[in-house]
Structures are given as C-alpha cells and as structure tokens.
Amino acid sequence: MQRAWYALLMPAPILPLIEAASRWPERGALIGLDLGTKTIGVAVSDPDRRLATGVETIRRKAFKADAARLLALAAERNATGFVLGLPINMDGSEGPRAQSTRAFARNLAGLTELPIGLWDERLSTSAVERELIGMDVSRARRAEVIDEHAAIFILQGALDRLKTLRGDR
C-alpha cells in the first residue's frame, strides 16, 4: 500500500506563540490565519517579521482542500511557520470555537512540519469591524474583507509581541 507524501512527515508542533517562535528560524515569513466557520482569513509577514499584509480570504470547503491552499501559500512565500488566532473567551476559558481551532491546528500539523503558533485573538474581529466602519466601508464590502483583515490584525499583534521580546525598536 502506497502512503501519501504527507503521511511521512513528522507532525508540526502546535505551541503558544512564544514557544513556537523558538522553533522558527530567525528570518522567514509567517502565515497568519483567522479561522472562521465559512472562511479563513490569510495574512503573511515580510521575511524580517515586521509587517503583516493581507493575502486572501479562503472560502472553506473540505479540510483537505483548505489545507492544500494554505500549504501552497506557505510554499509560495517560503514561510517558516503559521500563526493561528485562538479565540479565547474574555474570562480566559476556551469554548467551542477554540476547541474547533485546536482541532484544525492538529489536522494541519499532520500535513506540515512548519511549527504552528497559537495567538490570543480575543476581540480581533470586533476591532477590525470598528476600524472598517470608521473608514466608512459598506456592510457588503466589510463582509468580504473582514476575515483577511482579522488575519492581518492577529499576525501583526503576534509580530509586535515577538519584536518586544527581542528588544527591537
């Protein structure tokens, strides 16, 4: 019986952001993800990890198709890891959305060796929506771009935290 190529990989580690950062090389792009029930917002950092920019919003289909697109984006951009927004409740507990995100991370980890960092995304979508409303973006347009912008928000927050820990100015 022939096994698929991805069955030969060691699963990627899934770690809190700071621990994941210790597994990433010093330079290289990171892929930021905002996981929704219908879409996945995708952002990417520059190789020096200073700035997050939007890439696209993936309309979710089946996990394998979604994962294939994410892995293709990671390969195209020579990414060294993923930052996945973890929707933690305001009281610090993890509800069904966080459990679903962790399950997605476990499944993705089985297909890649790129370390996956989890970053608290509390209120990211709300903050982005307020910003888009402030920019007078129509409701229809907000619906199209909110997940990608949330991914930017999540990844930029993670990059800023890593920058602070490194002592960069």
Predicted regions and their residues:
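Phosphate- and other anionic-substrate recognition elements at nucleic-acid/protein interfaces
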Residues: W5-L33, K38, A43-R169
